[in-house]
């Protein structure tokens, strides 16, 4: 073996050893990477981050599958089903899942039904309590109603007592209850039951009253007008009509008040009646035109002191009403001012009473011009309030500007923490100064 062969063999051996060592290092690195973290005070559980156990997250954490989260609140009904929002929309028929209304009524309540031989062109949105197929007309039964027409000739059968031997046709079983789990009553459930009800004309719906079978009331209009009225009601009825009746339709006074009654009767209530009271209620009642002697008799009872001096001999005091013990000059008690048929005269009498009493008792009144300005005044006429107000307006903006000025004899690299603290304190106090400014502005506006 030559030296070159020895050298090549050694080189291949070194390469294979290097490759083995590289694989060992890779395996060693993988094994060390898969090891669980050691137990310590900060990590008491040695469950690593790569474990296959699911992470139990809080419910507020957003995930990529929000459909598995629970709802934050219970799903309420639509607002149009409970509250009337004023939108007159066409009423949708009830869903197929809802149980039929006629199947749970007593026998006497079912007396009003359809004639199976005649089909009336009533809109599908007329009666929301009957189950129907939304694709077809609600009362258009077609050939299905004619299949069992021999059972409709006044047999007196009710809904809940049906004959057991009913001839079924394949047309009646378009969709059986067992074939469609979403429609447990079947698409022709109401049609099969309505065929066995004795034929009577469809009633006109009246205003629904509580504990009243007015829905099954006999029609009060001729049959020629029924369809017109029904179509009009169907186009104008709102969605929330079955659950919420508008109280404004059934009240005497349609008003926006919360109890649906006006605080005062309407003005037409007093239109053609002279004996009814005036709708404008005065402050006090004057039964008849008073004469001066009765008022002077009352004045002797209510005047202060038993002896009437010469200064108040011409005055009289009313014993009741809003004027109380206010001294009233006798010459102002004019019969034209105390007439009860006009409120303007009463108002004029009131103003004349007050004006005369102010003239008589002028010494007891305070001159408002004496206290028009603030009492505390300096010699130069500038009040303390104006000084403080001006100080509060001018000083805080200057403080703000001073707080943003650089600190002298300091460079950027020489700034210390105390400088930052002092600048922050400056700005906080400046903001407080702005608040004080607005405080003084409010005081000035209110004062």
UniProtKB/Swiss-Prot annotation:
One of its GO terms (cellular component) is membrane. Residues 42-51, 115-158 have a biased composition (Polar residues). The keyword Transport does not apply. It is a multi-pass membrane protein. Residues 300-321 have a biased composition (Low complexity). The keyword Zinc does not apply. It is found in: Membrane. This is Uncharacterized protein C405.02c. It comes from Schizosaccharomyces pombe (strain 972 / ATCC 24843) (Fission yeast).
């Amino acid at each position: 073996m030559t030296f070159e062969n020895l050298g090549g063999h050694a080189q291949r051996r070194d390469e294979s050893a290097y490759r083995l060592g590289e694989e060992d290092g890779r395996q060693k690195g993988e094994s060390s990477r898969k090891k669980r973290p050691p137990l310590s005070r900060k990590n008491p559980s040695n469950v690593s981050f790569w474990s296959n156990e699911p992470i139990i997250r809080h419910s507020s954490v957003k995930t990529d599958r929000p459909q598995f989260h629970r709802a934050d609140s219970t799903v309420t009904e639509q607002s149009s089903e409970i509250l009337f929002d004023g939108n007159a929309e066409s009423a949708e028929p009830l869903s197929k899942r809802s149980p039929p209304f006629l199947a749970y009524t007593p026998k006497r309540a079912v007396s009003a039904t359809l004639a199976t031989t005649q089909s009336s062109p009533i809109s599908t949105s007329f009666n929301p309590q009957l189950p129907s197929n939304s694709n077809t007309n609600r009362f258009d039964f077609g050939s299905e109603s004619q299949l069992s027409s021999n059972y409709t000739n006044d047999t007196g059968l009710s809904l809940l007592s049906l004959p057991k031997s009913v001839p079924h046709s394949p047309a009646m079983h378009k969709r059986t209850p067992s074939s469609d789990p979403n429609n447990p009553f079947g698409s022709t459930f109401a049609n099969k039951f309505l065929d066995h009800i004795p034929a009577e004309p469809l009633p006109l719906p009246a205003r629904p009253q509580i504990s009243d079978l007015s829905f099954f009331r006999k029609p009060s209009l001729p049959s020629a007008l029924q369809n017109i009225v029904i179509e009009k009601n169907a186009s104008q009825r709102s969605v929330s009509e079955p659950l919420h009746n508008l109280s404004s339709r059934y009240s005497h006074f349609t008003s926006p008040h919360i109890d649906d009654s006006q605080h005062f009767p309407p003005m037409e209530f007093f239109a053609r009646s002279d004996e009814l009271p005036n709708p404008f209620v005065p402050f006090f009642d004057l039964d008849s035109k008073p004469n001066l002697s009765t008022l002077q008799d009352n004045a002797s009872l209510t005047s202060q002191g038993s002896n009437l001096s010469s200064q108040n001999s011409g005055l009289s005091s009313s014993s009741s009403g809003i004027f109380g013990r206010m001294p009233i000059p006798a010459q102002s008690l004019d019969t034209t001012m105390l007439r009860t048929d006009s409120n303007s005269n009463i108002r004029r009498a009131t103003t004349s009473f007050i004006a005369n009493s102010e003239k008589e008792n002028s010494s007891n009144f305070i001159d408002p011009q004496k206290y028009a300005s603030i009492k505390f005044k300096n010699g130069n006429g500038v009040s303390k309030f104006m000084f403080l107000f001006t100080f509060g307006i001018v000083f805080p903006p200057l403080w703000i500007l001073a707080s943003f000025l650089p600190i002298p004899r300091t460079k950027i690299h020489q700034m210390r923490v105390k400088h930052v603290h002092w600048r922050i304190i400056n700005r906080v106090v400046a903001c407080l100064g702005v608040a004080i400014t607005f405080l003084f502005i409010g005081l000035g506006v209110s004062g």
